[in-house]
């Protein structure tokens, strides 16, 4: 048992997810909002983006791609259906400086999705589970593709193709 636990810890130290994404949900347009549900939504999206393995590459914690996702909820159409907008930004450090350079800055005002409180956000690149996870996966692959393009010509192409699925 100790050997298994040690192996698990060592394997986790060598493998890290690709994104270090901050997530914010703005629901100020919703009258009498269920704050716990929106906090659960924010946490679920945060875990989905930051804990999913989007590539087969190994990332150290300090190599993770910095990004921000802001979802503004304009309408709650039903208990589990929402419409609003999403803003996605990513940046990367400039070599041998203390500065970051903006890589991606997108605003989409046509976001519509369903979310059930405490429901796990699942992803399989060959299946469609929900509009929310598909949109988030699209932007995750776009962020990764843009970041890989900063290292080599067409380096992000495989991730742009995954985003198109």
Task: Label the model's feature ranges.
Residues 3-13:
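Sec-dependent N-terminal signal peptides
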């Amino acid at each position: 048992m100790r050997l298994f636990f040690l192996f698990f810890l060592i394997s986790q130290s060598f493998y890290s997810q690709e994104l270090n994404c901050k997530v914010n949900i703005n629901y100020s347009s919703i009258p009498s909002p269920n704050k716990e549900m929106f906090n659960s939504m924010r946490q679920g999206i945060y875990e989905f983006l930051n804990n999913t393995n989007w590539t087969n590459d190994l990332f150290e914690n300090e190599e993770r791609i910095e990004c921000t996702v802001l979802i503004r909820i304009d309408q709650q159409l039903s208990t589990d259906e929402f419409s609003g907008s999403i803003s996605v930004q990513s940046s990367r450090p400039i070599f041998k400086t203390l500065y970051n350079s903006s890589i991606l800055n997108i605003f989409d005002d046509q976001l519509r999705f369903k979310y059930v409180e405490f429901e796990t956000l699942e992803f399989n690149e060959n299946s469609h589970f929900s509009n929310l996870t598909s949109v988030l996966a699209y932007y995750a692959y776009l962020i990764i593709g843009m970041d890989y393009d900063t290292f080599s010509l067409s380096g992000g192409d495989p991730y742009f193709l995954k985003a198109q699925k």
